[in-house]
Amino acid sequence: MNDVGLVELVESFPDAPTYRRLRIETGLSPKSQEAAERGLANTLYGVSLLKAGEVIGMGRVIGMGRVVGDGGTVFVVVDIAVRRDHQGQGLGKRIMAALDAWLRANAPPSAYVMLIADGDARHLYAQFGFAETAPASISMAYVARGPGSSD
């Protein structure tokens, strides 16, 4: 069913419990409550997709996306997610269009705007001017171990 018209994009980001649930529902890696609260507090800009007719907190948030960074030199597009039962309707593109508009209005011309594309999502991001950087540069990840962890 195509219910794009029943979905509202709002310039706000879900609370930590909703964020954590949506990450799991969309196949993103799980985050602890502490990590979610800290991270969301540092969002520069974020959007949520809300399904009309749903009770808040009962599956109403069906998508999200946000921008993090230092607000001047580096911006990172993160947490682009649409619930699986709503994928394939252009909702990811709506999220990216909102983030792209915000970046165009707020990122200085010399800023570096980046993201990590999972699988075929790179095709969506290419529509907004993102290009693969390999082999000139590659993405690397560091897994934080936190206080008290042993190596």
Region annotations inferred by a language model:
Residues 96, 103-117:
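Conserved GNAT acetyl-CoA-binding A-motif
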Residues 1-33, 151:
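Short amphipathic alpha-helix that is part of the acyltransferase structural core
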Residues 69-77, 87, 109:
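A conserved beta-turn-beta hairpin within the catalytic core of GNAT-like acetyltransferases
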Residues 44-65:
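Conserved beta-hairpin
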Residues 86, 90-98:
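Conserved acetyl-CoA pyrophosphate-binding loop and the N-cap/start of the following alpha-helix
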Residues 110, 114-116, 126, 131-150:
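Conserved catalytic-core motifs of GNAT/GCN5-like acyltransferases
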Residues 83, 118:
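Residue-level recognition of the GNAT/N-acetyltransferase active site
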Residues 67, 80-82:
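Hydrophobic adenine-recognition pocket in adenosine-nucleotide-binding enzymes
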